[in-house]
């Protein structure tokens, strides 16, 4: 027989559940407030004690109400936080299973896609998904099997709250760790985010991609094109993350394509720029676009990235010489439509001139003594001190260091004498470039 104390506790539980069942929206909101305040941070045994071993009876009511109301656009934040009290409690595996058995994951993912639901409510949904993902590998797999990666990535791209977007990043980071079955799916989802219109989403995706890349160890072919396109951004924080990812990617098999792509960006497509320039000429109101053309922003960022890579790894600097990077940098220095392209290209060229005597010789010869002295005196501000004729000389340069490199014997074998022996991966992509040089000459 139950004791008088136990009977009283059961009576209180039944009364509480009856109050919930009979309450309207306002009364239920008050009940949830009191529940969260009284039980936040409690363990599962403590919740059971509070509810006389009947906590699951309240949880099932919460999940049922969630499923009945989430599509109506009703406020969900208190309801989701109350469910979170159960799911985040220590030793709460039973509650978690009960929530998942009634389709909890699918409900949380559907909440992310509904326009009528408030951003704050969606943030609470993301937090519950974090709790589920952090509960173990099989729960991460369940989220991914429920098309969760796509739903979560799309929400990250569309979200207007940076705080919420950062919570989404935490969730994606959790899904990439300890999830070998679906880590490639998360990786591809992050790559798919790069072209999105949200700078914050791009920044967070790039950050998480660096982690994902180190875990997976192989690259997806589309990553090069996607990362290079991000360089057209006007947001420096996004550009920074893109360059940091590029620094990582040169250690993988996409290095040749990445270097070739960066050098190609130094000379934007004439067809694209001519379309934009003709528009500028015909409409004086868009003259300011000259400084913000995506292709020119991309050009400046590429020049900066090339400088970062060259300073980081001398072998990479040499490989870019074989891609005629000096010619392309000087051409970018002649782009009077975009001063930052001139500035970044000039700073990067300065490093190549200091590093390779053969480059110094060709640059001096092409520039002429007067322009070269200006360049040496202040490479960063050269764009402010040159006239239109000097800019044309730079833009129309025909510098080709590649042939001289072969004649002088400057190669990875010579460079290893001064800078140490390259690893096997470096030898592989050096060989790749040598083969292309021979094919071009033939």
UniProtKB/Swiss-Prot annotation:
Q: Per its UniProt record, what InterPro entries does this chain match?
A: ARM-like (IPR011989), ARM-type_fold (IPR016024), DUF5578 (IPR041090)
Q: Which cysteines are joined by disulfide bonds?
A: none
User: Which one Pfam family would you cite for this protein?
Assistant: DUF5578
Q: Which organism is it from?
A: Bos taurus (Bovine)
* Superkingdom of source: Eukaryota
Q: What is this protein called?
A: Armadillo-like helical domain containing protein 1
């Amino acid at each position: 027989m139950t004791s008088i104390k136990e009977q009283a506790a059961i009576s209180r539980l039944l009364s509480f559940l009856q109050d919930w069942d009979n309450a309207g929206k306002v009364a239920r909101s008050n009940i949830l407030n009191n529940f969260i305040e009284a039980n936040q941070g409690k363990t599962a045994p403590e919740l059971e004690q509070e509810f006389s071993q009947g906590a699951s009876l309240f949880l099932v009511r919460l999940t049922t109400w969630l499923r009945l109301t989430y599509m109506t656009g009703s406020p969900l934040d208190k309801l989701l936080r109350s469910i979170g009290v159960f799911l985040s409690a220590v030793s709460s595996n039973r509650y978690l299973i009960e929530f998942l058995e009634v389709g909890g994951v699918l409900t949380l993912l559907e909440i992310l896609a509904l326009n009528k639901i408030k951003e704050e409510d969606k943030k609470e949904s993301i937090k519950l998904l974090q709790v589920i993902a952090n509960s173990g590998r099989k729960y991460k797999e369940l989220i991914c099997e429920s098309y969760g990666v796509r739903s979560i990535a799309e929400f990250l791209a569309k979200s207007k709250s940076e705080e919420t977007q950062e919570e989404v990043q935490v969730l994606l980071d959790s899904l990439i760790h300890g999830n070998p079955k679906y880590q490639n799916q998360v990786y591809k989802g992050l790559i798919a985010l790069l072209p999105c219109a949200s700078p914050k989403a791009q920044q967070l995706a790039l950050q998480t991609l660096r982690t994902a890349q180190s875990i997976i160890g192989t690259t997806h072919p589309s990553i090069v094109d996607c990362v290079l396109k991000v360089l057209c951004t006007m947001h420096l924080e996004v550009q920074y993350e893109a360059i940091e990812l590029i620094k990582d990617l040169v250690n993988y098999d996409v290095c040749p394509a990445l270097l070739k792509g960066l050098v190609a960006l130094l000379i934007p497509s004439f067809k694209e720029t001519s379309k934009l320039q003709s528009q500028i000429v015909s409409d004086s109101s868009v003259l300011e676009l000259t400084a913000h053309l995506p292709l020119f922003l991309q050009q400046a960022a590429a020049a900066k990235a090339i400088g970062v890579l060259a300073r980081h790894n001398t072998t990479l600097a040499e490989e870019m010489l074989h891609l005629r990077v000096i010619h392309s940098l000087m051409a970018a220095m002649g782009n009077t439509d975009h001063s930052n392209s001139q500035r970044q290209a000039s700073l990067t060229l300065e490093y190549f001139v200091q590093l390779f005597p053969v480059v110094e010789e060709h640059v001096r010869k092409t520039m002429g003594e007067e322009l070269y002295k200006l360049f040496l005196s202040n490479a960063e501000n050269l764009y402010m001190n040159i006239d239109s004729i000097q800019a044309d000389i730079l833009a129309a340069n025909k510098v080709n260091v590649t042939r001289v490199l072969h004649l002088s014997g400057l190669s990875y074998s010579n460079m290893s004498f001064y800078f140490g022996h390259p690893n096997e991966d470096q030898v592989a992509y050096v060989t790749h470039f040598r083969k292309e040089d021979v094919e071009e000459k033939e």
